[in-house]
């Protein structure tokens, strides 16, 4: 099964802002980048998207261009929940909270947030469901950097602590086979 992992394009957030599950918009103009993304995708596919607008805008654009009947939003494709850190500048997060997370982001979470291992479990559930369907159509997943890194860890058996070795740039398309 072919899976295309697509990271949303740049957001309106200033650099240095923690915006995991906050529903922030996309920086404009984005149409040229969207066209570049589409050029890397199959002409027919099943499309899934995070329900956050920075992914949904791209999903709708792709749906219209490649004439896919529909796309499906799935909350398991949302970025990591950073809890009380959402929409704060990383530099404004107290070191006594941030440092332990930086040392072990896999198991430690922001207050009222989730850990990477929790995120990884939900991506694993999503992935298992798709694999069990045994579809012959490619799957396009429009999502976020944390989710892409998690999928790549599932795909390569890379330890979660090394997830940041997986590159996930804005607007990047990564094709994997399961």
Residue positions per predicted region:
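Histidine-centered catalytic micro-motifs
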Residues: 5-9, 142-147
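Domain-level recognition of soluble alpha/beta enzyme cores
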Residues: 158-178
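Phosphate-handling substructures
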Residues: 65-122
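Residue-level preference for the first positions of well-ordered beta-strands
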Residues: 3, 136-142, 173
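Short beta-strand scaffold positions
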Residues: 49-50, 121, 142-143
């Amino acid at each position: 099964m072919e899976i295309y992992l697509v990271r949303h394009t740049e957001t309106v957030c200033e650099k240095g802002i923690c915006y995991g599950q906050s529903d922030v918009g996309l920086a404009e103009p984005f149409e040229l980048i969207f066209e570049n993304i589409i050029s890397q995708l199959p002409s027919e596919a099943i499309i899934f998207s995070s329900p956050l607008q920075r992914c949904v805008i791209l999903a709708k654009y792709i749906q219209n261009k490649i004439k896919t009947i529909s796309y499906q939003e799935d909350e398991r494709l949302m970025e990591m929940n950073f809890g009380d850190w959402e929409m704060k500048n990383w530099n404004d997060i107290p070191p006594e909270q941030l440092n332990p997370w930086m040392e072990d982001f896999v198991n430690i979470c922001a207050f009222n947030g989730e850990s990477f291992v929790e995120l990884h479990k939900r991506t694993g559930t999503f992935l298992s469901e798709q694999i069990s369907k045994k579809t012959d159509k490619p799957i396009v997943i429009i999502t976020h950097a944390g989710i892409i890194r998690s999928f790549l860890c599932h795909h390569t058996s890379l330890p979660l602590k090394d997830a940041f070795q997986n590159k996930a740039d804005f607007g990047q398309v990564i094709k994997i086979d399961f």
